[in-house]
Each structure stands twice: as structure tokens, then as C-alpha cells.
């Protein structure tokens, strides 16, 4: 029940409906099932919307309508009396929060319109007004609100800012690291610290590898709920725990024993094959068979009796026995077919090899790890202190501050817990432990609503942990009193062809070992409507592989990205879709695993005329040519004796010195000085005191004087003005901003330059003043191999989309191409010198000196890199986590498609047909095989091979070179359409285009039918005007350039938001002005301004008129002076109407129009027409309008019976007025 006050001050009581009971929800589900609605809510959606009073975890598969469920649940809460500001709603991105807010807003508007209860209308209107203040946003945004409000309780000022620029963070980190490094190098334990640095960097001078280690440890700790406690208690957890063979986890030993038993079973299967050859010709056992039987028996015995024969303490002995027992190779060959029986076991043995030696030396690295722990802790504290001093923090800092505030202040925490009716989280699978801790503190323990899908957890690089979702899922299923699990399986996005192939692939691929969830019936995708189940045979998924048999090893490696042949396959399919199916380009999306090395896609698509839009690439802002030129200009202003920057500035388009000029300047050195900078040589060259003054000719001397004068003015201005103004002064003084507009990618270049000025302004506003500090900051960014964010420019809408799989999450597209399926998964992290794990802490490769094991030797030391036991433990977990995330990436990519999905890759056809496993084990690919395969393509081919008897809903097709010729690929059949923006520079263009279309249609009909039917003898003036006047209006037509102009426009902020003035409006205003202009007065700016006030146009159009050009016409041209001299003979904007004979029907028709100006004399007429078209050469417009002026002349001759002796076009669309006689 809610009380409001009406306009008379009287209380209004609103009675809200109670929350639904489980029985009421079941009743609602049954009603929905029996209803005749075309789109029904599923039983699970209804349950997720209306269940209340407990924690709820919604596992929502791709396309299952999770956003719909969230919006409906929020609306239901509001309608039952829960104010919107009492809901905490967390989203993964700002964009998602905006979209969710808009959906709620639309729902509230709709609800207000539907309700007839005045009191409810008032209440809903209040909710609408409160929506903008509601806690709907990212966890980062909420944490900022908490710290801004309660930061004082932990000593944090509310006037802080967020350091979003990674470059700024790295600059501060570098300063802190350098200072701390020097302190540790001079401390009491310096020898241990030096050994630590050498273990990772090789020597103490190059600290880059050690610095990366420290930064990574720091960043990893920041994703935990309490970084300091994690560093103190968990950082060395594995190093303290795993020091003996007995400490090896049981799970790892079980995997080894499982590999041994699997090897024995596979070997037995191979020996039972008919062609194996168990017996010799004499009937006795073959030597091969005897050897293999021994292996089978011993492996089985050792597995069965492991605890008795070996145990954990004898694990190293088991490894030696197995290594000596099995052959060194992986394969057993039967009838020329190779079976990789021993491959998995060899990989497991490698993991445990040299364990005894490793454990002997592992204890020596513990003091190094303690030093590392101390350094990272000290670095974390020092870095935070610097940020507190600057009052500038990272998002993780703010989140930890918020956690600290809520943990240490019971009253604040309880106020939030009492305030929030429910704590709702979207994309819960992508939460990290820091965010989970914050959510726990906000909740009262039984009011959490979490929506996500563990199969779409793909942000491990942001320290997202899918196990948070997984643990909740298990806990709620085992203990329903803790919470309820609701599964949304119905997919409302994709056709059955996409759903079936997704289910087929992941039911054979994903389980808890690899993928973190068993893809069983409760996780499989189900079509949400009957329309999705209608079959389309041409939409069956395709695995298209370029056959690399003929490459002879010359094909690009996986690291080199997608090949030209693969892109050509994609282009061929797109052309087929576009030509044969009429699929618009914007319905097609290409998904890639990373943004790098995709230039070949754009290049190839350009060759075939396929428009493409990318979501960006690597950050290369500071490496763009125009920005590098400006930075070198600023460096020169700051220090002219910087030769590198000075040469770059001289060679730039701003001053255009060539190699010959620079060589002449370089020879003007002072013989008395050993070293002489270029700036000094320029100064000597100007005053003629260089070593060879005769080389400085007059032209070069003039250029040098201009340069020195300009540089001097810039240096003077740099001391007085702001950076922003200095940059714009450079642009204006040397017209550099205008210059780049004439170059390739003009929009991008100008956007980059504009952004440089804005960033300089932002830099100074953040408290850093001066050119020197700005240059230093930029140089530090470059030193740390960082860059600033690229400036985006607007892209065409009708184009194929190219984006990363990560960027596509949450989106959907009719046709999806998953490219580069043969690219190996990045396993860089598992080969680093250290690996971090939340539970185990750090594991490192230790550079041990094993000189003692070698006996007598003359070597001072023998260093060997060893994988310590914690490192091996973390490595195995990281490998499985990486494979699991790649599997989920494939799931995300496939489920983006609405109609059809394509997989594109390359492979050797002959090798891919080799048998990879002797038999399938159950429904899943064998675990060992899934761990070995390192590409999407390998997974798909293995499934196609091992489960070939099933319908997997995708076809494998090899593409040969003969399929990729120009003739085979084909060409787009799309006609080249004129850009409508190129037709707006004058009044006539749009109507001309419309009239030409009409006339073309009429012409075609006249060719097929009797012309008289379509051209009546008598027509009204209004009818004739609609048909013919557009062709004859005195307004120019655009000259369309051979290449269409780009419509891209960067979206940087600008100060003017004036409406765009169309060129056609300017053309109309010019004609009106020429009609009313009093020619009896001297034509000057004042006369033109007075006349301008009398025309019917808005102020923007009047301002856009070039009055100087009009003045120039009357004052500087003979025709303009002719106007003033013979103004009594002048007629302006004169309408006419004449009869014309149709050449086909031989019928007469009326031709009407308006003539801009003509002079009527006793014996002749002079005709004048104004044109505002843009043009390159006047001859173009002369040819275009010759026939039009002939019609005007004919009309005048018929009317006055006098010849038209002169016909002039007045061209006002160029830089100055031009007169063309026609």
C-alpha cells in the first residue's frame, strides 16, 4: 500500500497486488499455454518473471529472451509497489544499461497509457521520473557513487577522477616501479633480489621482464576481493604446499593413471584388428604382438596396484618405468594407417618427468618468491599512495574502496541492504570475485536475482571467473533452500539449422572438464516458435576449407592470420548470397578471433566491390602520419635542437624541404665545432656564415626565412597560450588541417588532428600544464609501447560487418561467417616464466644451477630452467581454462546466427582424412583428444570423423584453387547507385532525377504502345507543370564525380550544432536575390545586404550566400556591367509557355518554364541563365545545358519574333564567377 498526495493535499491510497504464490504462477503458466497468442511466454520465463522471496539464478541460453525477462520482472515489481529506486540492477556495459533503461521507460509509458486508475497513473509517472536516478548501470558506476558519497569514512576525497587511459596509468606505474626498484637493489637482501630479477630478466640492467611480472601480479591481485590479503595469504600458497611428491594433487595422478589405462585399452583394440598380424606364418606370436601384450599387461597392472607398488612417494619411479616400457614414438601402424596410441601418455609423462630433480632445487626459489611478494606488496601500496595524492584512481581502486566502506561501516551496509528490495545482475557469468563480494555486501542474503549463461563466459582476460556462476548453479541445485535455478532453453533468435548444428557440435564437445558445463539436454537449444522449425535446405551449416595440399609449406602460418584464399572463399559465398538470394550486405557478418592481421579481408573485399565495415583494429593513433608530423612539430617548438624532430618538420608538407635542400643545409657546419645541430646550421645558412654559403640559393634562403619566422612565432606563442590554441595556430598558419583533407582517408586524418587538440586541452585541464610535460607524457606512452585510442569515423550502413567474437556478444545477424577457424588458440600464457592462479598463487620457472649434479666440470655454472611443481599445477589448470574459454567463444560465435552459419578455414585434404582415433568413447570426443586439438577447425573435423554416422547438421567441403578463379567467384550484379548527397548542390538536381525517371518510363511505354494514348492533345497547365517543368527550371545539375565520395563523419564533439544548409536552398536564394537586386544603385556589400533582407529565406541560408562572389560578378565581369548599363532592357525571372510537337505521337503539347534573365533590344535578344552547380571545368556545364538554353531561345524567338544572338551561362559554383557563352 502506498500513500500519495493529490493536488488538493488529500492523501491518495494505492493498493497493490501481492506477489504471486507458486500456485498462482503455475496457474498463469497453464493459462499462457492454453492461450491463442501468436508469441507465448514459456513456462520458465513466467517462473523467472514472477517468482519472489528467494535467491534466483536464471541460466539463460543464447537467444532465450533474458533481457525480456529482466524488463518484465522489473515492471512486475513496480506494479506491485516496489519503487524503481529500490532495485539494484547491474549490467556488464554502459550500453546495456542504457538499452535496459530505455526498455523500462517504454514499458512504463505503455502501462501509463493502458491504465485507467488515476492514482496508478500518478504512481507510474513518478516511477518514470525516478528512472533516471535509479541504480541501473555497471558495478563500476555504482562503486563510484558509493565512494563519492561515503569516501570520507575511509579517508578518500569525493573529488576524485578515473584514470581510464592506460597510457597514463603506465606512466605512473613506471615512476613508482623505478623508485622502488632502486630501493630494493640497495636493501639488506639485495643479493636475493638480484637473483630474483635475473631469474626473469637475465640481468639486472634489463628489467622489462621483471617489470611485466610485477605489473601482472598487481593486476591479478586487483581482481580479488581483497588484494592485500590475497598477496599476503594466497600468493605463495602453492609454493608452501607443493614441496614433496606426496603433495601432488590426487587429481593429477588420477589423470596420469587414466592416460595409462586408456593407452592399454587403445593398444588392445589395435592388436585385435584383423590386419594387425598377431601371428607369424609359422603360427607363433609375432614379436610385435608379444611386445604390445607386455605393454598392455604392465600398464594395467601398474594402474590397478599403484598404491601398493608405488604410491605418491614412488611416483618418480613409476614415471621412469613407464617411460622405459613404451616406445618413444606415438603411433602404431596397421595396414599403413597410423594410430596415435601413445601420444596422450607421452604428454602426461612429460608433465611428471624430472620430478625428483625439480623438487631438489625447488626449495631454492622460495626466498626469491618471498622477495617478489614483498616487492609486489610494496608496489601496490606505493602506487595507491601516488594515486591518492593525485586523487586519480583506476576502476578497481574504486571498487575496493566501496567494498571497504561497506565492510567497515555496518550502518552504511545495513542501510543499503534495507533499501534494496532486490539485487539484480545481468551477465552474471562474467563477474569477478571483487564484484561478487560487492554484490554479497549489498544483498540481505535472500534477494538476489542473477541472469547469465556459463556457456557464454568469454572474459577471462578481464579476470572474470565462470566458476562463480557454476558454484551457484551447483549449490542451488543441491540445496534449494539457498536459492532456485531456472533454465531458459527456448531460443527465439535462430532457425533450426543453426540450433541443430550448435547442439550437435557442443553435445560432442563440451563438458565440465573442458567447457565448465556438461552440454546435456538441460543446456541444449530448443526452438521457441514453430516458424523457427521450418526447414531450409540451403541454410545447412557449411565448413568450407581451402585445400592446402598444393601449398608445399609456403602457406602462411597460423600466426600470420587468415589467408587470401580463405577470404576469396568468403567473397564468393557473399556474392552468391547477394546475387542469387538478394541478401543485403548488412545482413552478413564476419567474425574473427582478434582485431589484428585482418587487412587482407578489407583489401580483398575492395577488389570484389563488397563494402565492409570493421569495428577497429589495434590502437595506432600516435603512429598515424598526420599525428606524428604534429608531434614532431611540437617537439621542435619545445627544443629546436632535436634533429630528428626538426628534420621531420622540415620534410613535412607544412614546409616541404626536399633531400637536396637538407643536404645543402647540412653542409653549413662550423669547422671549429666537432658536433653541430641542424638548427644551428639553418641559422648560419640564413646569415651566410656557413661553411658553404654559395650552396644556399635564393629560393632555399626564402624557405629558410619563412621557416625561422614561423617557428619563432610558434615558440613565442607556446609560452603565452594554451596547448589547444597553439595546435590550432599551427593548423591555421600552415594550412595543415586543410591539407590532410585532400589526402587519402581525409575524414580519419582530420579527426585525428582534431582529437590531438582536444586531448591536449584535456591534458592541461587535468592539472598538467605546458608543452614540455605534454611531450614528455606522449613519449612515455610510446616508450611503454602503448597508444591512445583511435578516433572513430562514421561508417556506411549498407556493408558487411567485420568484428571480433567478443564484440558480437549480445548481437545477432542473419548470416554469420566464422573466419580463420584453422588459427591455433593462443597458448602464450602457459609458456610464460610465471603463471598465476587464484587458489594456488604463483608458480614460476626457476633458473637453477645444476652444476652439482654434473660432477667435476670447468664451467662456473650450469643454468637450467625448471618448471616448479606449482608452475606445473597452474599450467595444467590454465590450459584447461583456455580451452574451455575457446570452446565458449565458438558457442557465442555460432549462436549469433539467425539463418545460417559458415565456418571458414584451410587444411590439407589428404591429412585430414587420416583416422585420428580408433574408436569413439561415448557421446563426447575423448578428453585427451579435446585437450590436444587447438583450433575450432580441428574440433569440427574430429567430430565429423568420429561421429560420421550421425547427422551433425553441417557439411565439410574442400575448396580447390580452380574454384577460386575470377570466373568461379563471379561479380556483384548490383548496379552502381548515385550517391543522393552528390545531387543536392543545386535546386534542380532532385527534380531533374525525378523527371528523367518519368521521361525514361514514358519513352519505354511509347516504344511499345501508341504514343497518342499517353500524350493527350489538351492538358491543363498544372498537369504539364508536374511533368515537364522540373526539366526546365533554371537551376543547375550536379556534376557527379567518377568516384563516389565517402559519407564518413567523425563523431568528436564540436561547438556548433547548426542545421545543415542545403546547396539547393542557396541556389533558390541566389535566384531570388538576382531578381530583386536594384541595379540603379552601385552594387556593393551594403546594396546586397539590403536586397537580401527582402528575399524569402531563413537566416542560415542568407548567411551562407557568398555576397562577395555576387559583387565580383557585377563589378569585375563585362556581363555584370552589361546588366547595369542596359537595365532598362532587362527582364528577370520571366515565365513562358510554348507549343511543341511530340516527335513520336505527332501531337502538340505545352512547354512551360522560367527564364532567369534576358535583354530585349529592337533587333535581337541576349539570354542569361545562372547556375550554382559545383564543377571542375566550365566546358562540362556548357555541354550539359546547351540543349536547355536552346529551348529557352526558341521560346523567346516564338514570342518576340527576334533572334537570340547571345546565350550566356553565369557559373557561380566555383571559386569566382565565370561567364560561359553557349
From Swiss-Prot:
Signal peptide segment: none
Organism (species): Streptococcus pyogenes serotype M6 (strain ATCC BAA-946 / MGAS10394)
Subunit structure as annotated in this protein's UniProt entry: Heterodimer of AddA and AddB/RexB.
NCBIfam families noted in UniProt: addA_Gpos
Binding site for ATP: 60-67
Reaction(s) this enzyme catalyzes, per UniProt: Couples ATP hydrolysis with the unwinding of duplex DNA by translocating in the 3'-5' direction; ATP + H2O = ADP + phosphate + H(+)
Record protein name field: ATP-dependent helicase/nuclease subunit A
Keyword Amino-acid biosynthesis: no
Keyword flag Ribonucleoprotein: no
SUPFAM superfamilies: P-loop containing nucleoside triphosphate hydrolases (SSF52540), Restriction endonuclease-like (SSF52980)
Keyword terms: ATP-binding, DNA damage, DNA repair, DNA-binding, Exonuclease, Helicase, Hydrolase, Isomerase, Nuclease, Nucleotide-binding
GO molecular-function terms, A-Z: 3'-5' DNA helicase activity; 3'-5' exonuclease activity; ATP binding; ATP hydrolysis activity; double-stranded DNA binding
Name of the coding gene: addA
HAMAP family: AddA
Reported cofactor(s): Mg(2+)
